[in-house]
């Protein structure tokens, strides 16, 4: 049984529940959550997939996201982590079904492709209008667990909210209703703009003893890079080669799972690779703005790169993956898809740094610099709750 103190205000406004469960979801939803609290009777549920403070709690504080009790954090915290993936996913389904049954929101919003998004199944079975942000993203790589989650949530959602025309076209080609598929753009520009002053004022370089353009920033945490023995060895051998070639600090913002994998494997990192606790949003972005290059498998890297390009502060963005669900940013020249071998990583990093230094730059991806996304999301939810109830569930109005 899920314990919670939350109660709806019952002030006549539309009741919207937002479900999330990881750091990237908090980041991407930050502006949307604030907008929903402004215009809806809103409840934020956090399915606690990340138990580390630096991967969850600190981000509510970074974005000043307070719950209905005036505290930093969600309205309802739901523990879901079990002894294996099956138990965790079962907990997400069971506990979300319990919450949605009891609270009966008018609409349920999820973003992305994490396991917490599978709570959408509960909303669907309970006939609660379901809205999905980041719909239609595909990298066409079945090795990624997120790819399965994307397909499930896209297909069952009542209204799909896409970042780009690539994503919208993909959903249309698979037969999903065009009349309930909208392109909003990515929420990241709005989030970055909202926190830009805090980012610029961060003293993280001083705290870590770093200087502008004299370090490389690293983030590597994706399942396909960490859990696969072959990929893990290939990637971190390449990272060591990068440290040797550039002979400077590589600051690794390291997730607990990645750190445990390094310890368990016994892999010896080059001494110039500094393993650091996961960094908060403002500190991490300050480091991105001042790094010689950013080497990352994060899905937000293309969007962050596009935003910084739009404000006249380009970054050398190198994506350590073999596929991407953001082809629109690749077309705009906002990042380099590097792969994970030593040759690929060294060549891509050399190119990214040289192009930045010479001013050979891409252009901001239009889908990634829209700062009105939260407004659009709120308006679409308000407009479509009744439409879905009438057209999909045939409920009496």
Question: Positions of the model-derived regions?
Answer:
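Nucleotide-activated sugar donor-binding and catalytic core shared by glycosyltransferases
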Residues: 1-248, 258-397
């Amino acid at each position: 049984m899920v314990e919670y103190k939350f109660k709806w205000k019952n002030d006549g406004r539309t009741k919207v529940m937002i479900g999330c469960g990881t750091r990237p979801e908090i980041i991407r939803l930050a502006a949307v959550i604030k907008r929903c609290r402004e215009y809806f009777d809103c409840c934020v549920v956090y399915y606690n997939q990340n138990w580390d403070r630096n991967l969850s709690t600190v981000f509510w504080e970074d974005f000043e996201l307070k719950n209905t009790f005036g505290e930093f954090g969600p309205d309802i915290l739901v523990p879901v982590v079990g002894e294996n993936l099956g138990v965790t996913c079962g907990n997400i389904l069971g506990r979300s079904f319990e919450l949605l049954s009891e609270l009966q929101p008018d609409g349920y919003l999820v973003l992305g492709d994490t396991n917490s998004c599978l709570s959408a199944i509960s909303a669907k079975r309970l006939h609660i209008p379901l809205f999905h942000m980041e719909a239609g993203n595909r990298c066409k790589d079945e090795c990624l667990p997120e790819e399965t989650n994307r397909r499930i949530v896209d297909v069952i959602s009542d209204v799909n909210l896409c970042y780009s025309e690539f994503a919208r076209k993909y959903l249309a080609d698979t037969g999903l209703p065009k009349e309930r598929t909208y392109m909003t753009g990515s929420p990241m520009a709005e989030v970055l703009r909202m926190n830009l002053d805090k980012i610029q004022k961060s003293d993280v370089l001083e705290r870590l003893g770093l200087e502008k353009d004299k370090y490389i920033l690293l983030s590597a945490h994706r399942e396909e890079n960490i859990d696969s023995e072959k990929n893990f060895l290939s990637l971190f051998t390449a990272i060591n080669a990068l440290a040797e070639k550039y002979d400077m600090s590589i600051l690794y913002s390291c997730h607990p799972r990645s750190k445990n994998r390094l310890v368990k494997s016994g892999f010896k990192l080059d001494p110039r690779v500094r393993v650091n606790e996961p960094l908060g949003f403002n500190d991490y972005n300050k480091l991105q703005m001042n790094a010689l290059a950013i080497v990352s498998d994060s899905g937000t890297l293309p969007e962050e790169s596009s935003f910084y390009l739009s404000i006249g502060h380009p970054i050398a963005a190198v994506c350590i993956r073999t596929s991407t669900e953001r082809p629109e940013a690749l077309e705009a020249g906002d990042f380099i898809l590097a792969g994970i071998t030593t040759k690929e990583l060294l060549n891509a990093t050399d190119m990214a740094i040289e192009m930045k230094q010479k001013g050979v730059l891409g252009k901001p991806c239009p889908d990634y610099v829209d700062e009105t996304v939260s407004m659009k999301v709120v308006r679409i939810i308000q407009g479509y709750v009744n439409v879905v109830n009438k057209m999909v569930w045939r409920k009496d109005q």
